[in-house]
């Protein structure tokens, strides 16, 4: 028996949080006031897989989460009983698909507490959502000599579009530094503001380190200077309660595939007043009211930003995913994931020769680490041989790697369906790596 298998057998996989509300899963029985991870895991068929004869331990949730059976079932139901193109069709299937698509929009509105459903735009993912803001807002309102504030922690998707805009317009990017724990230096952030500051882009949670940024505080400061803020919420929306009204953010972007939903779908929330002033990102069907060769009149929001046939099935699947997560409760999810992170952090800190990269006091369930003398890709390869899936590389956050003077890290990222036994399996796997390279 391998160290991984021993860890999985020696520790109960059931984690109970006595303060959690009841959870109803596809097993049909509510958890009755406790969070039972085994009942949750029963909803995820893929978690029963074996890798090389060993149980799959999926700890790559920051890259993409797994999909529960209710979401799979909803996608099948759409494809087998409701599939049609939306809008303008007067037949049963088209009207049904249109209704379900717009209901998914309303579900996302409620999930993030947007004021109106027209403030929710379906995109292909976080990357397209950010690019939509860059093209629709940035190209219209940011010009030569203007400044855009980003942070060292940003994913490349919230750096490259703004670099493209800065090069096109003659604007300048200013960067908020971080400390050795991977926390933003808020005092330095505030010093960057001046009369030329026109936009702020900041991630809610660092995908590379797990740092939870004080975005509400940052938004308030920016607004005091008349500057709008886009929040990259790709790593926050799946793991904690997001309230865009409370944050008062101007834009908020996230992806479906990190949220137990399908790939190819994402969300851009934008304040209606800003969206109405923005230019469309793409031209095509459904984003227009009228077209002649002389002039096109654009549709109202959100439709003017959804050109062509949208990802209908994916949107409906994402609606089912947020139903599933809401049924568990985002606060419950956050509490369970924090318990996993704390246990993993405690165990890794006891391991000589293993260093955690990113030790912020306020973190989401991301654990980036480096094993002395072992390249992260070798760590990932050996863990995979034990059935443990982690992500290795720069995590599309090369400025973060440069700040910590590492080429890459190994990253374990937890979800609510992970168990304490799986954390122990990760630790056992790291020990195996150290033995191989001893």
Can you describe what each PLM-predicted range is?
Residues 2-438:
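Pyridoxal 5′-phosphate
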């Amino acid at each position: 028996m391998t160290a991984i298998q021993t860890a999985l057998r020696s520790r109960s996989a059931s984690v109970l949080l006595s303060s959690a509300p009841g959870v109803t899963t596809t097993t049909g029985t509510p958890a009755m006031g406790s969070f039972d991870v085994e009942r949750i895991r029963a909803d995820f068929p893929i978690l029963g897989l074996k890798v090389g004869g060993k149980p799959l331990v999926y700890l790559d949730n920051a890259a993409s989460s797994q999909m529960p059976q209710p979401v799979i079932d909803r996608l099948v139901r759409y494809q087998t009983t409701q599939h049609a193109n939306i809008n303008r069709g007067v037949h049963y299937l088209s009207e049904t698909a249109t209704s379900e698509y717009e209901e998914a929009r309303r579900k996302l509105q409620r999930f993030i507490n947007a004021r109106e459903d027209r403030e929710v735009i379906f995109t292909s993912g976080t990357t397209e959502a950010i690019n939509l803001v860059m093209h629709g807002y940035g190209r219209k309102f940011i010009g030569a000599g203007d400044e855009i504030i980003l942070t060292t922690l940003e994913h490349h998707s919230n750096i490259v579009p703004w670099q493209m805009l800065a090069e096109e317009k003659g604007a300048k990017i200013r960067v908020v530094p971080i400390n050795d724990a991977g926390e933003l230096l808020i005092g330095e952030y505030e010093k960057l503001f001046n009369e030329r500051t026109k936009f702020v882009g900041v991630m809610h949670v660092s995908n590379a380190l797990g740092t939870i940024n004080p975005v509400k505080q940052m938004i308030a400061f920016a607004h005091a200077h008349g500057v709008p803020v886009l929040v990259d919420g790709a790593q926050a929306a799946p793991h904690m309660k997001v309230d865009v009204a409370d944050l008062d953010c101007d834009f908020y972007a996230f992806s479906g595939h990190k949220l137990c939903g399908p790939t190819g779908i994402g969300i851009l929330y934008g304040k209606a007043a800003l969206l109405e002033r923005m230019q469309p990102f793409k031209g095509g069907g459904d984003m227009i009211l009228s077209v002649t060769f002389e002039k096109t009149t654009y549709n109202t929001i959100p439709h003017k930003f959804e050109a062509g046939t949208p990802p209908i099935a994916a949107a409906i699947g994402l609606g089912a995913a947020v139903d599933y997560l809401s049924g568990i409760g985002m606060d419950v999810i956050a509490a369970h994931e924090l318990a996993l992170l704390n246990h993993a952090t405690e165990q890794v800190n006891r391991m000589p020769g293993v260093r955690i990269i990113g030790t912020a006091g306020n973190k989401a369930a991301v654990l980036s680490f480096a094993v002395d003398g072992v390249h992260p890709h070798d760590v990932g390869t050996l863990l995979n041989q034990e059935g443990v899936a982690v992500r290795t590389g720069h995590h599309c956050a090369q400025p973060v790697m440069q700040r910590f003077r590492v080429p890459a890290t190994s990253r374990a990222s937890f979800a609510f369906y992970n168990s304490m036994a799986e954390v122990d399996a990760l630790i056992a796997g790291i020990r195996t790596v150290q033995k191989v390279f001893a």
